[in-house]
Structure formats: structure tokens, C-alpha cells
């Protein structure tokens, strides 16, 4: 298939790889960004796309700072 508009296929595959490597655990956008070597904003755009496609499950992780962090987990 073709990669979605504005998303690079290699980055998309790296994001998917980061999530499948840790499944069933979930990662935050910043953790995915670190794993892939992109900015958090970029990682979030790819994660959002995968969530919209139903390939990734979104959840919230309660952080120590009190503000919940959105996490993403690969849906098998």
C-alpha cells in the first residue's frame, strides 16, 4: 500500500516497529520519538494516524506529575 499523505513510509515503519517491539506494553509519544529518533510532534502525528486507522490503542498513563500521559499500544 501507499503511505498516507505527508507521512514517510520509513518513519511510519519505525514507529510501528517501536510499538511492536514492546507489545503488549504501551509507549508515550516522547518514548516513541526517542526510539525512532524524531521529534515528539512528529511521533505524535504518526501515532495519531495509526490510532485513527485502528492499528494502535490509545490509553492514559497516570504520571507522577499528576497530569495523565497519553500512551499508545500496538493492537495485534
Task: Please give the residue ranges for each predicted region.
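Short, locally clustered residues in the helix-turn-helix/winged-helix DNA-binding domain
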Residues: 17-24
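Short alpha-helical segments that sit at the start of domains
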Residues: 1-17
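Flexible loop/N-cap segments at domain edges
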Residues: 24-76
Amino acid at each position: 500500500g501507499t503511505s498516507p499523505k505527508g507521512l514517510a513510509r520509513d518513519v511510519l515503519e519505525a514507529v510501528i516497529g517501536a510499538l511492536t517491539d514492546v507489545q503488549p506494553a504501551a509507549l508515550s509519544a516522547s518514548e516513541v520519538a526517542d526510539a525512532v529518533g524524531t521529534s515528539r510532534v512528529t511521533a505524535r502525528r504518526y501515532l495519531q494516524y495509526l490510532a485513527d486507522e485502528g492499528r494502535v490503542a490509545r490509553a492514559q498513563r497516570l504520571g507522577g506529575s499528576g497530569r495523565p500521559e497519553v500512551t499508545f499500544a500496538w493492537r495485534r
